[in-house]
């Protein structure tokens, strides 16, 4: 059923940055509503990588993506922000202090400011150009996202790619998969230096087979059951890797979707913002997280958290133009609704 909601801030996107924006706005007594095209909160963390380990959240040496979302859910619970999930924002009209947002299900949201936390926008995997790929995708022999590590227990796993996802999953599946081979077309990996060092150590121990420099060439099997992955080196020489599952990690193909039609200044499929406030080219509309772009931008979850705080503070005078904002630490004022 379509809903009509009036609030201070409409947050479009319910990934980590969008969820934390609820907290930052709530601490400034700004009402919020969360809108997301997915049917659950968490963005890619929940939909694609719930068991992926994250190592760069301050004070959390390691946490799975799903655990991070659970913690954020607990953190924002006191603010009871309404949610419009499974809704795609199709239209934005009005101006700073008086926006109207429409969704594909007919919802109407009236807000004084907007925070776009749409991540990469609409996303899907970059698929390798291999003959017969669709049959293996349908059977689960080729997977682009790992939602449950236990589903790969005892499997012969071939991972293709040279970035963080390929390296992190190779390390995470050690001791779970019966064998792990990592195929990369270059001798060096583009992952975080510490992760790349751990991968080299695992290879030296014999826990992981580094197949470099090679690239995917063909899949062999029958009726969707994978038997071997054929790889080729730079000279065209091939070898076969025994495999039950292939995990190609070649990044995501992303599309800003409706965001690109909202009249905002864009650059290379990102929304340009002012670094100190995260405000876009349209007054009253802000962008945070992976969708936002400015000089020196780092695509890190923790930077999205910082941007959420900056945007919330910049929004306060829009919602309360006659009220001075006195900065306070959370240790001083506490969190509303908590003991």
UniProtKB/Swiss-Prot annotation:
GO terms for molecular function: ferredoxin-NADP+ reductase activity; flavin adenine dinucleotide binding; NADP binding. It is an enzyme of class 1 (oxidoreductase). The keyword Isomerase does not apply. The keyword NADP applies. Its cofactor is FAD. Keywords: FAD, Flavoprotein, NADP, Oxidoreductase. Its EC number is 1.18.1.2. It comes from the Bacteria. Belongs to the ferredoxin--NADP reductase type 2 family. PANTHER family: THIOREDOXIN REDUCTASE 1-RELATED-RELATED (PTHR48105). HAMAP family: FENR2. This is Ferredoxin--NADP reductase.
């Amino acid at each position: 059923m379509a809903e009509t909601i009036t609030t201070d801030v409409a947050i479009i996107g319910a990934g980590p940055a969008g969820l934390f924006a609820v907290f930052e706005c709530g601490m400034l007594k700004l009402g919020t509503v969360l809108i997301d095209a997915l049917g659950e909160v968490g963005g890619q963390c929940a939909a694609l990588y719930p068991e992926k380990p994250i190592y760069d959240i301050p004070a959390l040496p390691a946490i799975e993506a799903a655990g991070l979302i659970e913690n954020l859910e607990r953190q924002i619970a006191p603010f009871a922000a309404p949610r419009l999930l499974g809704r795609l924002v199709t239209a934005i009209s009005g101006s700073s202090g008086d926006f109207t947002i429409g969704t594909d299900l007919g919802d109407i949201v009236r807000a004084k400011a907007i925070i776009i936390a749409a991540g990469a926008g609409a996303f899907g995997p970059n698929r390798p150009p291999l003959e017969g790929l669709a049959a293996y995708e349908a059977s689960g022999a080729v997977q682009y996202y790992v939602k449950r590590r236990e589903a790969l227990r005892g499997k012969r796993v071939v991972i293709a790619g040279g970035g963080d996802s390929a390296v992190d999953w190779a390390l995470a599946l050690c001791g779970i998969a019966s064998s792990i081979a990592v195929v990369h077309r270059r001798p060096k990996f583009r992952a975080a230096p510490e992760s790349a060092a751990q991968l080299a150590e695992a290879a030296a121990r014999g826990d992981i087979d580094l197949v470099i420099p090679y690239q995917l060439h063909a899949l062999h099997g029958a009726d969707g059951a994978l038997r071997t992955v054929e790889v080729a080196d730079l000279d065209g020489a091939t070898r076969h890797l025994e495999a039950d599952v292939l995990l190609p990690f070649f990044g995501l193909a992303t599309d800003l979707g409706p965001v690109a039609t909202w009249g905002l200044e864009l650059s290379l499929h990102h929304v340009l913002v002012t670094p100190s406030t995260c405000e876009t080219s349209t007054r009253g509309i802000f962008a945070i997280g992976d969708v936002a772009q400015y000089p020196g931008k780092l695509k890190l979850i923790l930077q999205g958290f910082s941007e959420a705080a900056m945007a919330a503070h910049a929004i306060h005078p829009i919602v309360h133009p006659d009220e001075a904002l006195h900065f306070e630490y959370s240790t001083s004022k506490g969190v509303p609704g908590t003991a």
